[in-house]
Amino acid sequence: MPEHASPLVSARSRAASRTSRSSRSPRLARLRVHRAPLSGPAAILAAAALWGTTGTASTLAPAGAPPAAVGSAGLAVGGMLLLLTSRGARPLLAACTRAQRWLLGLGALAVAGYPVTFYPAVARTGVAVATVIALGSAPVFAGLLAWATGQGRPGARWAAATTAAVLGCGALVLAPGLAGHSGPADGMGILLAALAGLCYACYSLIGRTLIAAGHPAAPVLGAMFGAAGLGVLPVLLASGTEWLGSWRGAAVALHLAACTTFLAYRLFGRGLRSTPAQAATTLTLAEPAVATLLAVAVLGERLPALSWCGLGVLAAGLACLTVPASRRRRGDREREHENDGRVREITR
């Protein structure tokens, strides 16, 4: 090799060495991952904010529109949007193992089960009681399921944050003047709301499991929600679709499909890349807070003092999970760096 070429070769070698070191450096890798907008807990909180608009939007539906039909319409259209815009949904089935295909099917069943159980629970117990039972039980179910399946034992931080968030959520929506039911709650309605929380915890945990196994988030959620959208079509058709003929009905269905299903679950899938499912379900307890604030600002409802106190406790619990811990064990940091590297490979 000519002598005058050696400096150029040396410079290239040094550049390649720096690139190789930076790609292996956990600190630099973490910085590159964190540059992505709305990733991790922030993406999940944004999704929860979109979900919080569901109640306000559903009040604008035409009178007589069945609640189950409204929810099924949003899932059917939004689920198909997620499926059609996920380019890797078809290759995903081929890339999955047999056990992972079973997980996809179970996840789709859980997605379809949520509106089928939640909306009847609302009709029996009221919005406040159904919301606090479904969303309050979901983090508990997620933590227990993750523990039972060997995906991580819930830590003290998760337990403290979940306890604060559930208590704050309960004070927020069950304060006097908000629940709307003076008598005892309907037992079947409570059971249906708890089943809705279990459904939500199941498909969150399944989605996180498949993403952690190396599958991209968008195809995973697209496959689950596309199949679930097809599954709830009979519910929509049996409940009646006349309300969709009005502009208000069409606008509500479009909002539920585009914002609270398509966009919200895209953000949720992005957040699941680096957030454990049990923490993600706790973060989604921001949904009733957003729904309550919208009810005050848009619908003119008034909150008692206990609800404002509950809102503060809920915010503190969510902040406990959103703000990174200042001190972590070295092993935890190394596992986080390895997961970040896996996520970068998935999203390329």
What are these regions (language model features)?
Residues 77-81, 133-148, 227-231, 282-298, ...:
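Alpha-helical transmembrane segments of compact multi-pass small-molecule transporters, enriched
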Residues 46, 73, 106, 133-134, ...:
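Hydrophobic core positions of alpha-helical segments in small-molecule transporters
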Residues 66-67, 126-127, 153-154, 215-216, ...:
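A helix-boundary/kink motif common to multi-pass secondary transporters
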Residues 61, 70, 121, 148-150, ...:
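Hydrophobic/aromatic residues within transmembrane alpha-helices
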